[in-house]
From Swiss-Prot:
SUPFAM superfamilies: P-loop containing nucleoside triphosphate hydrolases (SSF52540). This is Phosphate import ATP-binding protein PstB. It is a peripheral membrane protein. The lineage of its organism: Bacteria, Pseudomonadati, Pseudomonadota, Gammaproteobacteria, Lysobacterales. It holds the Pfam family ABC_tran. The keyword S-adenosyl-L-methionine does not apply. The keyword Membrane applies. GO terms for molecular function: ATP binding; ATP hydrolysis activity; ATPase-coupled phosphate ion transmembrane transporter activity. ATP binds at G55, P56, S57, G58, C59, G60, K61, S62. Its EC number is 7.3.2.1. It is found in: Cell inner membrane. It comes from the Bacteria. Belongs to the ABC transporter superfamily. Phosphate importer (TC 3.A.1.7) family.
């Protein structure tokens, strides 16, 4: 039986060579103690596009994603080597402020993690840690973030209710609102729909399409159909190596590496 390829629906029209680069890694390696999780990663992520990272479990996708906002700095014995440039500046440099980085690079995790406080305070929380503004300005920022996350119409009359009362899909969109409230330029999404039902997943995917007009988005997903639907570019990773990175249409229809071909056609992984 011939192997069925995944239909491509994402709009990946711009070649890598003409799209401005937002994030670039140079000879990037990462270590969990003595274990090397990433090996000489050289990757350019285009601005205001969606880049998907695919590959089997344990290949380094989430590790790479978390380097982009240095979340590993919270834990001892974890070390990144090499360079990661955001808008031309090396974010791995000790001179690059963590607070500055976190305001420019937002992150949404696999499981929705709303704070045990009101919907309003969930969105306002991060803003208060980075900026000082009056009540009316804060109200505007909270509304803007909820509008961008396609949640405003559902919660505008219950902003003072506990966020834990929202559905799973609403909670994940709230987490996206919390991330965009800081007006970052990059959004990192680590399997943002894996814990959601199909309807909520569809809402998040539609939202990603809307958000990429303002943000550079990097998404980790185990769902190759999702990668094909939402991304403009795709990187395939295996055992800590970046095997191939190209336009999504190219990756799924005519990959240049046999390992990529084998993975997307289900021969391994």
């Amino acid at each position: 039986m011939p192997i069925q390829r995944i239909a491509i629906t994402a709009s990946a029209n711009a070649p890598l060579t003409t799209t401005p680069v937002k994030i670039a890694t140079r000879n990037l390696e990462f270590y969990y103690g003595t274990f090397q999780a990433l090996k000489q990663i050289n990757l350019e992520i285009p601005e205001k596009r969606v880049t998907a990272l695919i590959g089997p479990s344990g290949c380094g996708k989430s590790t790479l994603l978390r380097i982009f906002n240095r979340i590993y700095a919270l834990y001892p014995k974890l070390e990144a080597r090499g360079e990661v440039f955001l808008d031309g500046e090396n974010i791995l440099s000790p001179k690059y402020s963590i607070n500055r980085l976190r305001s420019k690079v937002g992150m949404v995790f696999q499981k929705p993690v709303p704070f045990p406080m009101t919907i309003y305070e969930n969105v306002a929380y991060g803003i208060r840690h980075h900026e000082v503004m009056c009540k009316s300005q804060m109200n505007d920022r909270v509304e803007q973030a909820l509008q961008q996350s396609a949640l405003w119409e559902e919660v505008k009359d219950k902003l003072n209710q506990n966020a834990l009362g929202l559905s799973g899909g609403q909670q994940q969109r709230l987490c996206i609102a919390r991330a965009v409230a800081l007006t970052p330029s990059v959004l990192l999404l680590d399997e943002p729909t894996s814990a959601l039902d199909p309807i909520s997943t569809s809402r998040i995917e539609q939202l990603i399409e809307e958000l990429k007009t303002k943000y550079t988005i990097v998404i980790v997903t185990h769902n190759m159909q999702q990668a094909a639907r939402v991304s403009d570019y795709t990187g395939f990773m295996y055992l800590g190596d970046l095997i191939e990175h190209d336009r999504t249409e190219t990756i799924f229809s005519r990959p240049s590496k046999q390992q990529t071909e084998d993975y997307i056609t289900g021969r391994f992984g």
